[in-house]
């Protein structure tokens, strides 16, 4: 299994729609202002956060149960940024829609710009033949409110191509997060 380069990422996105919309360059400025970079890097792709957020709230005093998740645990926000309360959590989704080839697995790592501020971005691997918008998880580990910017980079996706095709892909087993179109809450 080997990591794939910018040339491969560009070809797979332009010819097969692996990433849509696809940015072939590394974008570091918008409207003359510095932003948190996104787009193609040497051996990965920096994904952006869309303007759709779900922020944890305790107004209903429920228990967080991944097998029986109550959507009332979140407040939905659509804005160009999201303020995550201290020691709290938010979900978002990517701007980009992904179509992962059958012989590819991705690993996604949060950008250091956010990590250095105590904001942890978690994304599970994109499995072979998974497709959809990626649900992003943000943890604010600080005692202060933390800001996430929509339309800017939040994490880097690394693509690994296997030497052989898997017997059963995510699509084959009807994965529960297949084809997600928005911020998707836990499913058991």
From Swiss-Prot:
Pathway: Pyrimidine metabolism; dUMP biosynthesis; dUMP from dCTP (dUTP route): step 1/2. Pfam families: DCD. Coiled coil: none annotated. It is an enzyme of class 3 (hydrolase). It comes from the Bacteria. Keywords: Hydrolase, Nucleotide metabolism, Nucleotide-binding. One of its GO terms (molecular function) is dCTP deaminase activity. The active site is at residue 137. It catalyses: dCTP + H2O + H(+) = dUTP + NH4(+). DCTP binds at residues 111-116, 135-137, 156, 170, 180. Its EC number is 3.5.4.13. One of its GO terms (biological process) is dUTP biosynthetic process. NCBIfam families: dCTP_deam (TIGR02274). Belongs to the dCTP deaminase family. Catalyzes the deamination of dCTP to dUTP. Homotrimer. This is dCTP deaminase. It comes from Neisseria meningitidis serogroup C / serotype 2a (strain ATCC 700532 / DSM 15464 / FAM18). The gene is dcd.
């Amino acid at each position: 299994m080997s990591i794939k380069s910018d040339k491969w990422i560009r070809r797979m996105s332009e010819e097969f729609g692996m990433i849509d919309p696809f940015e072939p360059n590394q974008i570091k400025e918008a409207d003359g202002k510095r932003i948190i970079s996104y787009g193609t890097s040497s051996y990965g792709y920096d994904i952006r956060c869309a303007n759709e957020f779900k922020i944890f709230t305790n107004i209903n005093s429920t228990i967080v149960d991944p097998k029986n998740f109550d959507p009332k645990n979140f407040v939905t926000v659509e804005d160009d940024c999201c303020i995550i309360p201290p020691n709290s959590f938010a979900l978002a989704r990517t701007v980009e829609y992904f179509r992962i080839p059958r012989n590819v697995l991705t690993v996604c790592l949060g950008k250091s710009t956010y990590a250095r501020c105590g904001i942890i971005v978690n994304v599970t691997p994109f499995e072979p033949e998974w497709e959809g918008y990626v649900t992003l998880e943000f943890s604010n580990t600080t005692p202060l409110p933390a800001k996430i910017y929509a339309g800017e980079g939040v994490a880097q996706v690394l693509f690994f191509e296997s030497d052989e095709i898997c017997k059963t892909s995510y699509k084959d087993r009807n994965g529960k997060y297949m084809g997600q179109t928005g911020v998707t809450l836990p499913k058991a």
